[in-house]
Amino acid sequence: MTFIIHFKDGHREIYSNRYDEDVEHERDAAWDDVYATFPNADYIEEF
C-alpha cells in the first residue's frame, strides 16, 4: 500500500509497504506499520 505522509512543517513524503490492500487484516497491518514508522506525522492519507 502507498501512503502520503503530511508533516506539521508542510513537507510530505510518500511511503509504500508490501501489504495487500484487498485483504482486511493486511490493510490494518499496513496502517499500523505506517503509524509506527511516522509517529510524528500530522496527517496520513492512503494513496
Per-segment meaning from a language model:
Residues 1-8:
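A short beta-strand micro-motif
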Residues 3, 29-30:
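Amphipathic alpha-helical segments in structured regions that serve as interaction surfaces
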Residues 11-25:
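A short, exposed loop/beta-hairpin motif centered on an aromatic-Gly-Thr core
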Residues 31-47:
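Short, mixed-charge low-complexity intrinsically disordered segments
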